[in-house]
Amino acid sequence: MTLATPPATNPKPSWPVFETPLLGRETVADRTMSFHFAKPVGWSYRAGQFVDITLLDPPETDAEGNLRGFSISSAPREDVITITTRLRDTAFKRVLQAVPLGTLVKMEGPFGDLRLHHAARPAVLLAGGIGITPFRSILVETIGGGALRYPVVLFHANRRPEDAAFADEFRSLGHRDPNLTFVPTMTAMPGSGYAWDGERGHIDAAMLRRHVDGLVDPIYYIAGPPGMVQALRTMLIASGVDEDDVRIEEFTGY
């Protein structure tokens, strides 16, 4: 007697999987929007982590599919789960902007291990564009819980002030905690309608030296597009920073 082979089953994931409703949308910069979702009772995450979001039965889709990974831009102490993204012209982004509030999505996670170190060394955070999102979560959570334990310098590169998400919030956090220094820099000011008297150009060693005492002393965290992340990592190591003191988080074009 031949026994039939049972159909293969997908093993149950070892991380949380749940459905949660979209509660709100908020424009936080030009072509950049935050999406707020309900946070389930008992679900938790660490500042700096990310989740996978799947659209359920969307009205349209494309070759990129219905699943994306997003850093969580909200802090664990906040009441909602927030993700923040550039509004590229994809089916996923169009659906997320258009569906009624209350629409359910599937969320999986949290994942990732981007977190500030515990040692009493200064930190330098280098963000490009939407790569700022995990740093917003980390800084709001840490400063909201008391204060930073060591100096932190946050560099955020954008094309124009119009593109810089959370800039006013970072300035406010810097006034609240003297250990935080915020250094925004703009790379395409001729295309802006704003006046600007801050840093200009891409983040480089010369810019770092203007704001960081002892280039090899801090631990560095880099988040942004892969090309920027790798260029900054190469620059830091060439400047004498130990490669073990460089932590990276790459953001692809989701």
Model-derived segments and spans:
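Conserved beta-strand elements of the Class I
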Residues: 124-126, 221
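Conserved S-adenosyl-L-methionine
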Residues: 144-150
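Reductase modules of NAD(P)H-dependent flavoproteins
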Residues: 3-7, 12-18, 92, 152-254
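Histidine-anchored nucleotide/phosphate-binding helix
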Residues: 132-144
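A short, basic/flexible loop-to-alpha-helix module at the beginning of a structural domain
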Residues: 108-119
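Ferredoxin-reductase
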Residues: 3-103, 158-160, 187-188
